[in-house]
Amino acid sequence: MPTVLSRMAMQLKKTAWIIPVFMVSGCSLSPAIPVIGAYYPGWFFCAIASLILTLITRRIIQRTNINLAFVGIIYTALFALYAMLFWLAFF
C-alpha cells in the first residue's frame, strides 16, 4: 500500500499548481461593453435580452391559450434561464 499512496502524493504534487489558478480565475476585469461612450456591464445586456425573450415567450404562451399555474415563478425562472444562457453564450 505505501507505493499507491506515494504515487498519489506524487500526482498531487504535480497538479497542486492548478488549485491557485482556479481560485484566481475570477479575478479578471468584468466584461464591459462601450455604448455611445459609456461602459455598461455585460450582465446588463444579458438581462435586457432575457427580458425581451421572456416577453416573446409570454406572448407565444398567451396566443396558444396555455394556462400555467404559478405564473410568477415560471416567468422568473425563464428570465433567469435566458439570462444565464446569454451569459454563457456570449461571455
From Swiss-Prot:
Is Transcription among this UniProt entry's keywords? no
User: So which domain of life are we looking at?
Assistant: Bacteria
Q: Where are the transmembrane segments?
A: 33-53, 70-90
Lipid attachment locations (N-palmitoyl cysteine):
27
List the cysteine pairs that form cystine: none
Q: Where in the cell is it found?
A: Cell membrane; Membrane
Q: Which InterPro entries match?
A: YtcA (IPR031381)
Keywords of the record, alphabetical order, are: Cell membrane, Lipoprotein, Membrane, Palmitate, Signal, Transmembrane, Transmembrane helix
Residues of the signal peptide? 1-26
Q: Provide the Gene Ontology terms for cellular component.
A: plasma membrane
Q: Where is the lipid attached (S-diacylglycerol cysteine)?
A: 27
The similarity annotation says: Belongs to the YtcA family.
The protein here is known as Uncharacterized protein YtcA
Q: From what organism does this protein derive?
A: Escherichia coli O1:K1 / APEC
The organism's lineage? Answer: Bacteria, Pseudomonadati, Pseudomonadota, Gammaproteobacteria, Enterobacterales
UniProt lists the gene as ytcA
